């Protein structure tokens, strides 16, 4: 299947203040957006794709000045792909607090003339959804054919169906959860602690010091990356293989340099992440993950929380995902069935753990493709 080709982001400016769940207010702010495909005359074929922790608005295609800059879900979105841009108008939005162009900690605070840094307010999944709704308004989209996301993106899709039930026809929620477990909050806390304890963090105002808490970011990414892979996948990729420059495969160095292939891989991932991601953004997004819990306002009753939803749902999980295990997706399915909602559920046997939602698995892609065929018939796409 062909790629969507060269794409370009554009920036949308919003003058109407946005009141956040914390009570803070953002005045003027901007969101970076990419679109793919054509919006039909009825404006009925729009699909919003919500991104996860370290992703962005750049869902598909490549940038003209960097042919290696493939979008993070390019295998899913494009001409003839499961989310077919020959039929649907797809929008990717970079969320508030991110470090890829939307207003966030790296942006200039108009009150001080310096980057917000640690002064940028805490944002939630619900705040992101309200900001995304303003993007939809700007495009004249009253109702999305679908809102789709994986992991944290799936939480946003679910939140859309709760906050704007009249504006979502279908909610596609993949490898996600209705709330983080204590274990998941603990992983986030350890990752944040690595950043906060880095001497180069400077209380979040490291921009003024001309440094970056790279050590903390590296460790945070290494911790997170372990949780994205399955035990079987790591065993197959690395096992106990040694990494030796001299080619010796069975001798230990008896020191604390990189010894095993898996160590080398994690350090590489950590270094790469520290090159492009912002530490304050990492803190904000992991806290947004922690806070997401739509059942909290209903005494922990997810069925009650979902009682006023009107969308149809596709919920999918992966059997080897232990970060957001299938049992968490089944909680959502049960709550929807308790409310007699239309829900399709698939539990996919893929070996790649949580990151399977990003990969090109035939069974997974066929499932999504078939579901979008159904949506296309409904909207005449």
Swiss-Prot record:
> InterPro entries from the entry?
AB_hydrolase_1, AB_hydrolase_fold, HAT_MetX-like
Where does the chain bind substrate? 221, 355
GO biological process, alphabetically ordered = homoserine metabolic process; methionine biosynthetic process
Q: Where does this polypeptide localize?
A: Cytoplasm
Question: One MF term in GO for this entry?
Answer: homoserine O-succinyltransferase activity
Q: Where in this chain does the entry annotate a coiled-coil region?
A: none
Catalytic residues (positions): 151 (nucleophile), 321, 354
Summarizing the function annotation, the protein's role is: Transfers a succinyl group from succinyl-CoA to L-homoserine, forming succinyl-L-homoserine.
Q: Which PANTHER family match?
A: HOMOSERINE O-ACETYLTRANSFERASE
Q: Which family does it belong to?
A: Belongs to the AB hydrolase superfamily. MetX family.
The protein in question is named Homoserine O-succinyltransferase
Q: Which organism is it from?
A: Burkholderia mallei (strain ATCC 23344)
């Amino acid at each position: 299947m062909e790629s969507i080709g060269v794409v370009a982001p554009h920036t949308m400016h919003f003058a109407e203040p946005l009141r956040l769940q914390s009570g803070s207010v953002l005045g003027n702010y901007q969101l970076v957006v990419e679109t793919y495909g054509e919006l039909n005359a009825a404006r009925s074929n729009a699909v919003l794709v919500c991104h996860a922790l370290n992703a962005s608005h750049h869902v598909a295609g490549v940038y003209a000045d960097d042919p290696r800059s493939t979008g993070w879900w390019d295998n899913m979105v494009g001409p003839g792909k499961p989310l077919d841009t020959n039929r649907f108008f797809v929008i990717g939005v970079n969320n508030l607090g991110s470090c890829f162009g939307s207003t966030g900690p790296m942006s200039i605070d108009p009150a001080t003339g310096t980057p917000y840094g640690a002064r940028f307010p805490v944002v939630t999944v619900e705040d992101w959804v309200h900001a995304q709704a303003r993007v939809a308004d700007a495009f004249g989209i009253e109702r999305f054919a679908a809102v789709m996301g994986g992991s944290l993106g799936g939480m946003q899709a679910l939140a859309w169906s709760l906050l704007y039930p009249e504006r979502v026809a279908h909610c596609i929620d993949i490898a996600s959860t209705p709330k983080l477990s204590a274990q998941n909050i603990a992983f986030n806390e350890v990752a944040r602690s690595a950043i906060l304890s880095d001497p180069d963090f400077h209380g979040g105002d490291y921009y003024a010091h001309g440094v970056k808490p790279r050590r903390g970011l590296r460790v945070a990414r290494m911790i997170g990356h372990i949780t994205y892979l399955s035990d079987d996948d790591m065993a197959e990729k690395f096992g106990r293989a040694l990494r030796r420059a001299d080619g010796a495969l069975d001798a230990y160095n008896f020191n604390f340099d990189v010894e095993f292939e898996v160590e080398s891989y994690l350090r590489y991932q950590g270094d790469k992440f520290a090159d492009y991601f912002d530490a304050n953004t990492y803190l904000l997004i992991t806290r947004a993950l922690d806070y997401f819990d739509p059942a909290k306002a209903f005494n922990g009753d997810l069925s009650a929380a979902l009682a006023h939803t009107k969308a149809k749902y596709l919920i999918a999980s992966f059997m080897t995902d232990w970060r957001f295990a299938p049992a968490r997706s089944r909680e959502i399915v049960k709550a929807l069935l308790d409310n007699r909602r239309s829900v399709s559920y698939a539990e996919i046997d893929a070996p790649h753990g949580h990151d399977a939602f990003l990969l090109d698995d035939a069974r997974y892609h066929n499932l999504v493709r078939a579901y979008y065929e159904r949506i296309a018939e409904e909207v005449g796409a």
